[in-house]
Amino acid sequence: MKTLLHICCAPCANQCIEVLRGEGVELTGFWYNPNIHPFTEYRSRRNCLREYAQTIGLPLLEHDRYELRPFVREVAADIAGRCVKCYALRLFETARTAAEEGFDSFTSSLFISPYQKHELMREAAERAAEEYGVQFLYRDFRPYFRAGQERARELGFYMQKYCGCVFSEEERYLKESKRIP
């Protein structure tokens, strides 16, 4: 089965790739993450993924345009509900690309994170699969999260501290500032 794997970052992807390859799935990575801010963060994550993909022989398709403004316009009206729109944005683009490029299915490394809203991601992926007529290959990768983080550290990957969006970064720093006396 030829599957397009949306990849948010190399640390999240390494165990997803290992699991799926272990199942005999033929993978191609897909970089599309308009939510990531600032540009230096976007570039660090993208470059880390490029190096990792090359090292493990993973073909990689890149929708490599820094699209912060369209992302912010999309989510700004409902900051609290931004994650649903962000998941949909990335998963619909992954499904569209999978259909156009002749893949049998698609999935995402987002499904490894215990910090993401898993059921909302799954619903978005299922809607995207229906719209584009390509199978959504669901896997709950969360049990592999810690092993993936450990492996990423062993490999010297760039390790980020937030999901990527400007609003998540803001929340992170606001929480930290409240702990400082």
Where are these regions (language model features)?
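Nucleotide-activated chemistry modules centered on ATP-dependent adenylation/adenylyltransferase
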Residues: M1-P181
